[in-house]
């Protein structure tokens, strides 16, 4: 049957490449697109093509942008004294959705001299006074934070990291030991 519906199976295989989409989900999506909403499928295809051809990395922070600078880096009302280091451009989106942070960001995806030089340039150009680490909690992240802090000593910055511990609504039995340990040792007065 695969040879007879080659284009359908090509669609299923393409959908399977997306995160969290397995073979069954890809098949359901393909059937829905082809049989029930072909116009929506064409709109989706156009939106994907438009996004892929128009979106690239911000030249300053490494986040997503349709221009040279992203909307955050080009916003003069942002708090330029605060710089949040994240591991991926997606992390910027997640933090922005919280509505709690109003400073700048820098995507620190890997430890290399080019990224470190870009980070130093951003600190100089914006008068950054505080670095906030928003990395996934791990021993490797802790080591990376210490390394970055050491490399940025010349700027006399204030270094902080986002709080971590027990997530809201999660039973203690389901919390990993590192998170529970940090939550206990970094407890706050109520």
From Swiss-Prot:
In terms of domain of life, where is this protein from? Bacteria
User: What's the stated role of this polypeptide?
Assistant: May play a role in DNA repair. It seems to be involved in an RecBC-independent recombinational process of DNA repair. It may act with RecF and RecO.
* Key words of the record: DNA damage, DNA recombination, DNA repair, Metal-binding, Zinc, Zinc-finger
Stated name of the protein: Recombination protein RecR
Output the NCBIfam families linked to this UniProt entry. Answer: recR
Which residue intervals define the domain Toprim in the entry? 81-167
GO MF term set: DNA binding; zinc ion binding
Residues in C4-type zinc fingers run: 58-73
Has the keyword DNA repair been applied to this entry? yes
Q: Could you state one GO biological process linked to this protein?
A: DNA recombination
Under the heading Pfam families, the entry gives: RecR_HhH, RecR_ZnF, Toprim_4
Return the SUPFAM superfamilies for the record.
Answer: Recombination protein RecR
PANTHER family reported in the protein's UniProt record = RECOMBINATION PROTEIN RECR (PTHR30446:SF0)
Family classification = Belongs to the RecR family.
């Amino acid at each position: 049957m695969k040879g007879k519906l080659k284009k359908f199976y090509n669609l299923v295989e393409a959908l399977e490449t997306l995160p969290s989409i397995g073979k069954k989900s890809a098949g359901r999506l393909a059937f829905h697109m082809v049989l029930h909403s072909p116009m929506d499928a064409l709109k989706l295809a156009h939106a994907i093509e438009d996004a892929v051809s128009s979106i690239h990395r911000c030249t300053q922070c490494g986040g997503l942008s349709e221009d040279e600078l992203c909307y955050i880096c080009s916003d003069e009302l942002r708090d330029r004294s605060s710089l949040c280091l994240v591991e991926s451009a997606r992390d910027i989106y997640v933090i922005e959705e919280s509505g709690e942070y109003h400073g700048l960001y820098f995507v620190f995806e890997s430890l290399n001299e080019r990224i470190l030089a870009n980070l130093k340039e951003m600190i100089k150009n914006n008068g950054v006074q505080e670095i906030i680490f928003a990395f996934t909690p791990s021993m490797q992240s802790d080591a990376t934070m210490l390394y970055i802090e050491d490399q940025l000593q010349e700027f006399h910055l204030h270094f902080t990291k986002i709080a971590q511990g027990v997530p809201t609504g999660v039973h203690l039995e389901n919390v990993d030991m590192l998170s529970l340990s940090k939550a206990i040792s970094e407890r706050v007065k109520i």
